[in-house]
A protein has these predicted regions:
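Short, structured segments at the rim of ligand-binding sites
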Residues: 1-179
């Protein structure tokens, strides 16, 4: 997961010595760590990562006059839900950097891989439920977040009279449901 890696990187200016981390398995939420790495570089970090390992050395923080932060893509599905449920006009200006999962939601795709975007599981499942249905995959790791996001999403769907089925790595969601 990117959160502990980002935390280590951003805390490393005060480290008394370098740290070498080995990573195992398939990485998840990789975009967030890359964003942390880029911001740290803008601020003076020489740290980098490669496949299977990250070497983190203490660094001197040198703040630039400004840092441009990317938009929070995970809020786009919320805007899409408001539009779908309440008939609000929605104009999306996506950028080349907009995540593949968000682009698949915008195109109303029947399958979405959330390996790098587990934050989208709940709004994506509702969009699929009120739309044509579909399958969310790559979300097995979301069971170990602040809550079990697969089970929490099922619970929330059921609270609104909708349903889905948990799979080993996500959800299968029937379409044409109404909250």
């Amino acid at each position: 997961s990117s959160q502990p890696l980002s935390a280590m990187l951003l805390a490393s200016p005060s480290f008394p010595f370098p740290v070498r981390l080995e990573t195992y398995g398939k990485g998840v939420s990789r975009g967030y760590f890359q964003m942390s790495l880029e911001i740290a570089k803008i601020c003076g970090s020489k740290n980098h990562s490669s496949s299977g390992e990250i070497n983190i050395v203490p660094w001197e923080v040198s703040l630039p006059d400004s840092i441009e932060m990317p938009t929070e893509d995970s809020l786009i599905p919320i805007a899409m839900l408001i539009s779908e449920l309440h008939g609000a006009k929605l104009e999306l200006n996506t950028e080349p950097s907009t995540s593949p999962a968000i682009n698949r939601l915008i195109k109303k795709s029947s399958s979405i891989d959330l390996r790098d975007e587990s934050d989208l599981i709940c709004p994506a499942s509702v969009l699929m439920a009120i739309g044509n249905g579909g399958k969310i995959s790559g979300a097995a790791h979301s069971r170990g977040k602040e809550s079990n996001r697969v089970e929490s999403t099922l619970y929330l769907l059921r609270c609104f009279g909708m349903d889905a089925k948990a799979t080993s790595d996500g959800l299968e969601i029937p379409g044409n449901q109404s909250p």
